[in-house]
């Protein structure tokens, strides 16, 4: 009988840990936890749809930001140009970071 009691308590602990993990992940992703705190009770279709939306946001998030900033400026549908400009901006930011690192290295070598 004591084995059954141990199994029950370990299942509750595992379930609690899963719920906490899901709540933390949802908080990191900017989504609220379900009202009952039980993410497992959501319908599978809703969970799959949420996952698909998250993947799309991760892949094309920066393009969407560019489109929002440029509302009305370019409506001819040249998304390639917007993607290239976004990539160029990222490359420029990376170059700035490299310059700062280089300056720090030179200072360290002089000391």
Curated annotation (Swiss-Prot):
Ranges annotated as biased composition (Acidic residues): 40-84
Chain positions found as N6-acetyllysine:
15, 103
According to the record, the residues making up region (Disordered) are 1-111
Which residues carry the post-translational modification N-acetylmethionine, per the record?
1
Crosslink feature (Glycyl lysine isopeptide (Lys-Gly) (interchain with G-Cter in SUMO2)) location: 103
Return the protein name: Prothymosin alpha
Location of N6-succinyllysine modifications: 15
Q: How does it assemble?
A: Interacts with NUPR1; regulates apoptotic process.
| Post-translational modification as stated in the protein's UniProt record | Covalently linked to a small RNA of about 20 nucleotides.
Q: Which residues carry this modification: Phosphoserine?
A: 2, 9-10
Basic and acidic residues composition bias: residue spans = 13-31, 101-111
Please name the GO terms of the biological process aspect recorded for this protein, alphabetically: chromatin organization; DNA-templated transcription; negative regulation of apoptotic process; positive regulation of transcription by RNA polymerase II
Protein's job: Prothymosin alpha may mediate immune function by conferring resistance to certain opportunistic infections.
Q: Which domain of life is it from?
A: Eukaryota
Task: Kindly give the InterPro entries that the UniProt entry links to this protein.
Answer: Pro/parathymosin
Homology family: Belongs to the pro/parathymosin family.
Q: Name one GO molecular function term.
A: histone chaperone activity
């Amino acid at each position: 009988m004591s084995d059954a009691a141990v199994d029950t308590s370990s299942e509750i602990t595992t379930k609690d840990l899963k719920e906490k993990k899901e709540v933390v992940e949802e908080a990191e992703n900017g989504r609220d936890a379900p009202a009952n705190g039980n993410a497992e009770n959501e319908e599978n279709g809703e969970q799959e749809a949420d996952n698909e939306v998250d993947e799309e946001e991760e892949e094309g998030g920066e393009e969407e930001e560019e489109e929002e900033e440029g509302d009305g400026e370019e409506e001819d549908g040249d998304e390639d140009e917007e993607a290239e400009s976004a990539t160029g901006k990222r490359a420029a930011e990376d170059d700035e970071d490299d310059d700062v690192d280089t300056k720090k290295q030179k200072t360290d070598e002089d000391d």
